[in-house]
Amino acid sequence: MRAVVQRVSRGVVTVGEETVGEIGHGFVVLLGVGREDTPDDAAYLAEKIANLRVFADENGKLNRSVLENGGSVLVVSQFTLFGDCRKGRRPGFSAAAPPERAVELYAEFVRRLAALGVPTAQGRFQEHMEVLIVNDGPVTLILDSRKLF
């Protein structure tokens, strides 16, 4: 499972004219589910993201988590995080989980975040979305549950 985690002052997802997810300060997480992923991958990333210390404390040091900072997380499915661009000019997506499996693990990730006490909002799985991300910093991190990077 892969996640691009962006610290934001605001995040909004719309589908057509409908706003389906919106947060103030916190994280926008673009989440990709891999073919080999399990619920353990969802649990690992949820715990890691909930406790990442990338928010400033009273001394300006990046020492607080989204939980400690009172933030929220907007989760957006993003199968293209498993795109393989090593050959040719068109990415291959064979490493991404099939949609019926990916939606289960995406939902598990969101459930795990919420169980840790993180307020969450979501995009809409397998829909064309417009995502507004107002970066704060910017602070952007790339995480992989298999610790590949």
Curated annotation (Swiss-Prot):
The UniProt entry's GO biological process terms, in alphabetical order, are: D-amino acid catabolic process
* Claim: Repressor is one of the keywords in the record: no
Q: Where is this motif: Gly-cisPro motif, important for rejection of L-amino acids?
A: 137-138
Q: What is its main location?
A: cytoplasm
Tell me any Pfam family this protein matches.
Tyr_Deacylase
Q: Which domain of life is it from?
A: Bacteria
Q: How does it assemble?
A: Homodimer.
Q: What does this protein do?
A: An aminoacyl-tRNA editing enzyme that deacylates mischarged D-aminoacyl-tRNAs. Also deacylates mischarged glycyl-tRNA(Ala), protecting cells against glycine mischarging by AlaRS. Acts via tRNA-based rather than protein-based catalysis; rejects L-amino acids rather than detecting D-amino acids in the active site. By recycling D-aminoacyl-tRNA to D-amino acids and free tRNA molecules, this enzyme counteracts the toxicity associated with the formation of D-aminoacyl-tRNA entities in vivo and helps enforce protein L-homochirality.
What is this protein identified as?
Answer: D-aminoacyl-tRNA deacylase
- Species name for this entry? Desulforudis audaxviator (strain MP104C)
